[in-house]
Every structure is written in structure tokens, then in C-alpha cells.
């Protein structure tokens, strides 16, 4: 469980630290910092919605739903009994990222984003957006943790594949 809590707390700490830097050096100055021209920049944004900035739910409902999901992830990780490093790592990243964004939602009602890859612009669900959104460390941790669950499913949950069930979903 140390690995779970180490990653959870590390993600929260790194997320909070980098968001504060983004506020100071990007929001307060109104500047965007180009790292790789035409590809990657540090660009300040505040996101009231969920993935890709979509606002499907009222902020209060989104806050409650996010709290329930993050709590469920933590409870599942604590009581599941699986102590494999990949299990603890993936759920630690997901929980840490969820808490990092939840802190923003509780304190300001929106999530601070600042990492931007300019990969493609177009329409998604009828709304024009940069199809690669501006995101943050918490989002990255959630995505990496979820990808770990998919890629290493058989190693994280060996009992489910040993019984002949190859279905992930």
C-alpha cells in the first residue's frame, strides 16, 4: 500500500505545484510559453467541464459525481486485496489525479490546465475545439493509470484471465 499512497501523494503534490506555477507565470502574466514551436506550449486555461472541456453537467453535480468516483477508486484499491505493484500504481495514479482536479473544483469551481499539444483542430460533438485539449499533471496521471489497467490487465488481475475469461469489459 505504500506504493499506492506514494504515487497518490506525489501526483497531488506535483499537480498542485505545477498549477501554482501556471497561475503565476501564465495566468497572471497573460503569456503562453512555446516549448516546441507549432507542437507544444504552456498555455493557461480554466476548465469548468470534464474531458475536452465539455460541460455536460452543472458544476455542483459534477463536483458530487467526481467525489463519488474518486472515493470509489480509493475504497476499491484499499479493500480489493490486490497488492501487485501494477495494481497499486495504476490506482494510485488515478486516485491522485482525481484528487488533484477535485481540489481545484472544490476551491474555485474549475480545473487549471496548462499543457497544450497543438495536434489538430476541428469539431467534436458539434462544438469547435482544439481536438487535443489543454490538460494538466492530474489528467496525465489519470490517463497513464487507466492505460496501465488496459495494457497490463492480465498481470494486474491474473485470476480473471486464468479462468479463461479474456474479456476486459
From Swiss-Prot:
Its EC number is 3.4.23.36. It is found in: Cell inner membrane. It comes from Chlorobium phaeovibrioides (strain DSM 265 / 1930) (Prosthecochloris vibrioformis (strain DSM 265)). The chain crosses the membrane at residues 56-76, 84-104, 132-152. The keyword Ribonucleoprotein does not apply. InterPro entries: Peptidase_A8. One of its GO terms (cellular component) is plasma membrane. The active site is at 113, 139. This is Lipoprotein signal peptidase. One of its GO terms (molecular function) is aspartic-type endopeptidase activity. Belongs to the peptidase A8 family. The keyword Protease applies. It catalyses: Release of signal peptides from bacterial membrane prolipoproteins. Hydrolyzes -Xaa-Yaa-Zaa-|-(S,diacylglyceryl)Cys-, in which Xaa is hydrophobic (preferably Leu), and Yaa (Ala or Ser) and Zaa (Gly or Ala) have small, neutral side chains. Coiled coil: none annotated. One of its GO terms (biological process) is proteolysis. It comes from the Bacteria.
Amino acid at each position: 500500500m505504500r506504493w499506492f499512497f506514494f504515487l497518490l501523494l506525489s501526483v497531488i503534490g506535483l499537480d498542485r505545484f505545477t498549477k501554482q506555477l501556471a497561475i503565476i507565470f501564465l495566468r497572471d502574466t497573460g503569456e503562453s510559453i512555446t516549448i516546441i514551436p507549432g507542437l507544444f506550449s504552456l498555455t493557461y486555461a480554466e476548465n469548468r467541464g470534464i474531458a475536452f472541456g465539455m460541460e455536460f453537467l452543472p458544476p455542483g453535480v459534477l463536483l458530487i459525481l467526481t467525489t463519488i468516483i474518486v472515493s470509489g477508486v480509493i475504497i476499491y484499491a484499499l479493500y480489493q486485496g490486490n497488492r501487485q505493484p501494477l495494481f497499486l500504481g495504476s490506482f494510485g495514479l488515478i486516485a491522485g489525479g482525481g484528487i488533484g482536479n477535485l481540489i481545484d473544483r472544490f476551491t474555485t469551481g474549475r480545473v487549471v490546465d496548462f499543457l497544450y499539444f497543438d495536434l489538430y483542430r476541428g469539431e467534436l460533438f458539434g462544438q469547435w475545439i482544439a481536438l487535443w485539449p489543454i490538460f494538466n499533471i492530474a489528467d496525465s496521471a489519470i490517463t497513464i493509470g487507466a492505460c496501465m489497467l488496459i495494457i497490463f490487465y492480465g498481470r494486474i488481475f491474473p485470476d480473471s484471465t486464468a479462468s479463461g475469461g479474456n474479456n476486459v469489459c
